[in-house]
């Protein structure tokens, strides 16, 4: 199975461009350099909202979020990952807020980079926080439309990188999304932006607490995300997904 990418989609130097990414991909070592701090952000001021299904974890307004980022910096954690809880009134069937340059994610990125320019910022690319149905893609005729979703994901990735995101992390599991995102980034001169692909994302009940945290799980329907996330019994398929994403230009992959 060939998992060797090709230039220009694959640029191994991207992983070496900044200190945080060099630390993240250092081999045969286990330290704070291998950690990513996930942070949940919400609207408001002075908000620290405990997530009931994740004991010890809270959602933070941007002002409070900065304190958590400061803690990460002091602990030498190289990167944080941002996940938004979008207010219900701002969601719609297309998840159009996902590519609004003034959305909660973009404002968070700008605030963090202003105070802590050296920490890496990883941003989730998927529509589930922004759609009123909670799916990762556009629902058309009761099906997830893969290719129309890719058009939205491209725009979502661009506004995040424009705001200062260092690593785009597509978690949507649409076919072809890594290649499309790599192309749109390169075409807009973001050659050094990393892509961390959720290469093999399983349709797992363990995502329940995460969906509670971002408020996206209540209207998924009886099949949930089975038509695009993977069957947990399929390990060979996982290797195929990893190979596809590397060939499309992913710099890092995770399961």
Language model region names:
Residues 2-7, 18, 27-36, 42-255:
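Alpha/beta enzyme core
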Residues 13, 20-21:
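Acidic, Ser/Thr/Pro-rich intrinsically disordered transcriptional activation regions
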Residues 24:
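Residues that form generic nucleotide/phosphate-binding pockets
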């Amino acid at each position: 199975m060939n998992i060797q990418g090709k230039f220009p989609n694959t640029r191994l130097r991207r992983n070496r461009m900044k200190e945080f990414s060099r630390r993240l991909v250092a081999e045969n070592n286990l330290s704070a350099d291998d950690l990513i701090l996930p942070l949940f952000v919400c609207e408001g001021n002075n908000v620290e909202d405990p997530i009931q299904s994740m004991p010890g974890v809270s959602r933070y307004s941007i002002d409070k979020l900065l304190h958590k980022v400061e803690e990460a910096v002091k602990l030498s954690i190289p990167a944080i990952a941002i996940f938004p809880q979008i207010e219900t009134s701002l969601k719609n069937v297309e998840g159009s807020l996902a590519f609004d340059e003034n959305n909660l994610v973009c404002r968070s990125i700008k605030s963090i980079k202003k105070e802590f320019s050296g920490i890496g910022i990883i941003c989730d690319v998927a529509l589930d926080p922004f759609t009123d149905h909670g799916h990762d893609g556009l629902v058309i005729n009761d099906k997830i439309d893969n290719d129309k979703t890719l058009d939205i994901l491209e725009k979502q990735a661009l506004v995040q990188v424009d705001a200062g995101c260092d690593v785009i992390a597509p978690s949507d599991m649409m076919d072809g999304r890594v290649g499309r995102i790599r192309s749109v980034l390169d075409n807009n001169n973001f050659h050094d932006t990393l892509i961390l692909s959720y290469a093999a994302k399983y349709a797992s009940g363990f995502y329940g607490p995460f969906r509670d945290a971002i408020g996206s799980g209540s209207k998924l329907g009886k099949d949930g995300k089975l038509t695009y996330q993977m069957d947990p019994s399929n390990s060979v398929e996982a290797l195929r997904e990893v190979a596809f994403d590397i060939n499309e230009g992913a710099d890092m992959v995770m399961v």
